[in-house]
A protein has these predicted regions:
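Conserved ATP-binding subdomain of kinase catalytic cores across diverse folds
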Residues: 1-92, 122
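Short, glycine/acidic-rich beta->alpha junctions
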Residues: 2-5, 111-112, 129
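Short, flexible active-site loop motifs that bind/organize anionic cofactors or intermediates
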Residues: 13, 99, 125
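Catalytic activation segment of kinase domains across protein kinase-like and atypical kinase folds
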Residues: 31, 36-62, 124-178
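Active-site activation/catalytic loop segments of kinase-like enzymes and analogous catalytic loops
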Residues: 98-101, 106, 174-179
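Conserved alphaE helix
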Residues: 104-116
Length: 179
């Protein structure tokens, strides 16, 4: 996915109530890309060709590299703003790390995967290559994992690279407008 598609998916998921890391900015580097264009997936350029910047240049250019800037997950912003001086911060830990470090069991790991798959589907998306490194759990200051009311670890998507709408339609169809 292009950085613009990743941000669009993050906004779509957030609007659907699916927790994600916070998209902050997309930056186009000033220098030309050194990657040969033939190694890149060209579909992103085709799906974005009708979208342009105010000066008329395409928003996504083959000869440029882009950096996506995401918020660092260390707890809910509203909690951090209120309790920053009182409590230490939470920390994001991916599901693989949480399992490998003994914070969750293998069964809980599988439940987290199923939960993330279900959350994505509830928002009309899927990830055919979903990995445990693609979503975060929250490690609380007391070194326990934050849990839902049902006792399962809460999950927050942090990798949008392989997301797609269920059925495979592109995020930026010809007549669509990015959020």
């Amino acid at each position: 996915n292009s950085p613009f598609e990743e941000f669009a998916y993050a906004f779509q998921l957030t609007a659907a109530g699916v927790p994600t890391t916070y998209p902050r900015a997309i930056y186009m580097l000033g220098h030309r890309s050194t990657l040969p264009p033939e190694i890149l997936d060209q579909r992103r350029y085709e799906s974005h060709q009708h979208l342009s910047q105010p000066d008329g240049t395409p928003i996504l250019q083959r000869e440029r590299n882009y950096i996506s800037i995401w918020g660092y997950w260390n707890g809910l912003d509203e909690v951090l703003a209120r309790e920053d001086r009182i409590h230490p911060h939470c920390r994001g830990i991916n599901a693989d790390q949480a399992r490998d470090q003994g914070h969750i069991t293998p069964d809980e790991y599988d439940a987290c995967y199923e939960n993330m798959t279900r959350l994505l589907a509830s928002a009309g998306l899927e990830s055919p290559q979903l990995l445990g490194t693609h979503y975060l759990l929250t490690l609380l200051p007391d070194k326990t994992i934050q849990r839902n009311p049902d006792g399962l670890p809460t999950v927050r998507l942090c990798n949008f690279e392989f997301l797609r709408p269920i059925g495979g339609a592109p995020a930026f169809a010809e007549n669509s407008v990015p959020p």
